[in-house]
């Protein structure tokens, strides 16, 4: 049962493990798990790399969640807290924000109580609280290519030991995707071919960039092949808006494509 002590709530491991049972990708919490990280490292791990109940099938009062504490079109402030109550009709939840993240609160009542009311759309329930859970999921996914169960177990053990002992830390996209059963990329960054200097070429490039971003990748684009601003576009008797404007258009995709948690696409 979730424990209430004045304004503090604590993680109910037994309940979370029951919820985890509905997700075959996630490994349950065991007593030997200890690594949760601290501060920003913990928030980044929980927000970007853990497996979550994205459909909120198991979300209920007392659950530990990641949420947007302060809305901002470019840099929303994320934090951690516990669900106090849920109104499923209005899709709003009251959340007790962890003390570490209350400095971003602005409304006097929220500052005083530490309790905020937020849309369920900006609340996520992580099922992996310990790094060891992520390591087990990753090791399972990386070993899954082996053709026999014996080999899968062998390589699961090898991968897990390297990961859990922090001898090797995979790229963020591997941490997020390996073993999750989702169609995401394991590569953090992609360098795109030169953009063809035509409407069709730009449209095709933009399409490919969006596809990569939607699967978690960052994209490097070289716009030197695009004609400068005010250059004549003969076919339509008009002028080009220039390479900078087209690159800006591609860069704006980063604000439209979310990649898990609060992570967004990257353009270089």
Language-model region placement:
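Extended catalytic cores of very large enzyme megasubunits
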Residues: 1-268
């Amino acid at each position: 049962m979730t424990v209430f002590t004045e304004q503090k709530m604590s993680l109910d491991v037994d309940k979370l493990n029951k919820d985890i049972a509905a997700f075959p990708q996630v490994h349950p919490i065991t007593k030997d798990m200890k690594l949760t990280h601290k501060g920003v490292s913990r928030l980044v791990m929980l927000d970007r790399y853990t497996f979550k109940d994205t459909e909120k099938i198991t979300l209920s009062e007392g659950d530990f969640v990641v949420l947007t504490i302060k809305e901002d079109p470019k840099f929303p402030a994320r934090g951690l807290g516990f669900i106090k109550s849920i109104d499923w009709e209005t899709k709003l939840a009251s959340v007790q924000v962890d003390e570490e993240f209350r400095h971003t609160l602005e409304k006097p009542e929220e500052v005083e109580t530490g309790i905020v009311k937020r849309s369920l759309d900006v609340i996520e329930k992580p099922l992996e609280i310990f790094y060891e859970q992520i390591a087990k999921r990753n090791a399972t996914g990386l070993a899954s290519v082996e053709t026999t169960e014996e080999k899968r177990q062998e390589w699961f053990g090898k991968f897990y030991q390297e990961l859990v002992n922090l001898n090797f830390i995979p790229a963020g996209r591997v941490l997020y995707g390996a073993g999750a059963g989702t169609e995401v990329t394991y590569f953090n960054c992609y360098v795109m071919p030169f953009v063809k200097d035509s409407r069709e070429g730009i449209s095709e490039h933009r399409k490919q960039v969006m596809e990569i971003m939607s699967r978690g990748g960052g994209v490097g684009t070289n716009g030197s092949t695009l004609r400068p601003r005010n250059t004549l576009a003969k076919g339509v008797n008009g002028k080009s808006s220039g390479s900078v404007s087209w690159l800006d258009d591609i860069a704006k995709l980063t604000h439209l494509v979310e990649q898990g948690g609060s992570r967004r696409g990257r353009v270089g």
